Amino acid sequence: KQDPMLTTEKVTELEAKLDRLKNYSRPKAAEEVRRLAELGDFSENVEYQLAKGKLRGINSAMLTIEHQLKNAEIIEPNTQHEQVAIGHHVTIEGGGKPKTYLILGSIETKPEQGVISHVSPLGSALIGKKVGETVELKIAGKEVSYKITKIE
């Protein structure tokens, strides 16, 4: 089951992508399939098979995005900073310099940019905690602990 948590920015991005697929990519791909179908023998027509595959891929992408948008739960800006919640920036310390993470839904996760999912091991350990609390978890088979120093 896909995580439904999305920011309004991600919803806007998905709506734009769906619009491009519906109004540009799909009609163009469908026209290419029609053009190649007119050439006759489908079994020997590699271009036709590739065009059909591309059209199936576009249709699949459209269905996925439509499903994501239909089931989306918008991450509302949270002005309460007592406890860690989805949408918060959380600064933690442990084993080196402080690190700040933004906790979002799994569709928007970019760990290399400090964006983690609320269902990731670290994200789920942080949810509901307060400044000053320590979370302990196992990462790559190793016990680690982090102290929460700031919630924004």
Language-model-derived ranges and their functions:
Residues 21-24, 36-39, 65-72, 129:
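Conserved, well-folded catalytic cores of nucleic-acid-processing
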